[in-house]
């Protein structure tokens, strides 16, 4: 068997699957190495994809030609758009998925990609020659040769699980950890640390009193994750349920804190701030009498349920006793307890924006090994790493995304510029150009770039062009079509908005909050005829995109002007230009940070914590600006 590849991806989680698929689809001979072929793209924690800002990332992955969105649509058992009460910049898709069907849908995709081979094994060592990675060795003593390697090992590097005082080595429940690989990489001067995450109990649904819980239904409209022309819902759509903890449960949890790995010194690593354990919640918020819990199905046919909001590493007996104090769980039976896991990660400031190591050429890092948390954040990094690994093998310009192009761009820029001291989770608040990074236009932003790269194929590109043309036609019609006050005022009163004193353009009416493209078209026959010309199955998607462009035109334009101004600083390259130690006009902290991160541009330098505006002015002067 030939063990020589262009690209090898270590780990078949969400980052690894996207990385391997991208590299192979671009034409690189690719190998994806995983400990267990039956666990590819395993959803280790919540059986859900998307959420606030995360849903936008999944749509961006899809727009780039990735697969997470397609697999999610294919295996979703509940779909919702979050933040509907806010503006479209904040709307985020989220889906519950069938955990096992998600795995097998991904495996079917991977096994049918030309150029992609899957190998089941554990990697123990990378081979580096003259500062460049050239291969790896596995525990089966197989040597692989590669031009590029992408590390996407998730929580498996020296993983250690905790339930109370019990500690068990492993990368996930009932799965072994990966040893020696961290040390092999660290030998070459790459710094690493430890982080922690956790997961809640899994509950036998036959023991739950659903009548004592509130139901949470999904939505059945046209929204989905993928921009491809696929059917909206494939599987039976299921409910979720909500309830609350109570003071009795909190007292049980407090009494168990002495045996909590988080509070007795057993766990020293930092956990995710925005997904705290239940014991952290009751300690951090002692006055809060209840915390909301979400009970979520693990699949279409299983009785297994995931208890969102009750992540814990307390002893199993404490977890069960506390939950039984909640009326809906008074007869609780669990499949397994919640647990915490500690694992190795690598400081992401040691990476370029392509996710290639600055210290070892052709070695890329993506996913949780970079200090992030979440399937979506992992997948976004994975597709960028896979693309750039292919480019390193076959030539071409590095492929990066700017902060005004994608949430993936914000994510990677934050990682490589600011670093992490806790697991990084994406939020809309991390993006300064939220109005430009909406869920509805990820295809408009990214698909053409991926098409030029060769990752997006003709069918997806044709869908983009037809959608773009239809949206432009609608916007142009409303911009040019004149409305007479006498002919529309009765309709405006029916729609609950102020009558006109004089004529206006149709676009001015649609800008009103009470007016939508669909409701005003019922009173403007010419506009209705224009909309009826759209025979595309995605008509609702097209109308939504056009309406957002119309209603938010001013905000979008203003944000674009700001982004373009700051983009000028991105054009001022400074990497390798300065000996920062010798620049006494910079603050001491700035010299240290600039030397460590070695930013590519003035704009990146300006985002480094500890580098002040006056330090940036010094660099601008020295750059001749």
Curated annotation (Swiss-Prot):
Q: Which cofactor does it need?
A: FAD
Gene Ontology terms: biological process: tRNA methylation; tRNA wobble uridine modification
Query: Where does the secretion signal sit in this chain?
Result: none
- What does the entry list as the binding residues for FAD? 11-16, 123, 178, 368
Instruction: Give UniProt keywords alphabetically.
Output: Cytoplasm, FAD, Flavoprotein, NAD, tRNA processing
Do the record's keywords include Zinc? no
Q: Which residues bind NAD(+)?
A: 271-285
Q: Which GO terms describe its molecular function?
A: flavin adenine dinucleotide binding
Q: Give the matching HAMAP family.
A: MnmG_GidA
Protein name per its UniProtKB record: tRNA uridine 5-carboxymethylaminomethyl modification enzyme MnmG
Organism, scientific name: Bacteroides fragilis (strain ATCC 25285 / DSM 2151 / CCUG 4856 / JCM 11019 / LMG 10263 / NCTC 9343 / Onslow / VPI 2553 / EN-2)
What is the gene called? mnmG
